[in-house]
Amino acid sequence: CLTVDCYPGVDDEIFDLIKEIYKPDFVIKSEDVFYEKDELNKMMTPFLTEGRVRGVMYYGKMDDLIDDIKLAQYQSLASHKGRVLVYGVGASYIHKGDTLIYCDLACWEIQLRYRKGMPNFKQDNDDEDILKKIKRSFFIEWRIADKHKMDIFENIDYFLDSNQEGNPKIVTGNALRSALK
């Protein structure tokens, strides 16, 4: 099983590239284990104040936003025979993977993509005020994504930088961890 865990905002270009190279027999997209948009919005309401910019910092974790029933269903699917690809935000919750790739994206690049119309995670807010998109990311999405990245950091086999569209870069997890010492 190849698991590609992603920071929110990584686009389908990376998914398509990995599918082309890995040629999986079975694909699981991790986005499906998260609560649906309306439920997520209800959970996030206390942290997203009325103003365009100010909010309340969310101190929870990514798994707070994951539906345990869906997660269990997808975890059983990950034992499918053949080449399985588990891809997306929080993918390592579904399966740790025989190989774990973490696909990263800088917050600045995410802001640039928001300006081009990218929605927030599990939302359809393409045309929403850019400051509200950034507020949702700053107070909630980036917090949980950063915690999750640190939780799995020591287990990452390859670290993929997806900041430059059309030009992803990859380094081994060991090389990155050594460079950061």
Question: Where do the protein language model's features map onto the residues?
Answer:
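ATP-dependent NMP and nucleoside kinases share a basic, alpha-helical "lid"
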Residues: I21-Y22, L71-D124
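N-terminal active-site beta-alpha-beta segment that forms phosphate/nucleotide-binding
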Residues: C1-D38
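NTP-dependent small-molecule kinase module
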Residues: C1, I14-K23, K116-P119, F138-K181
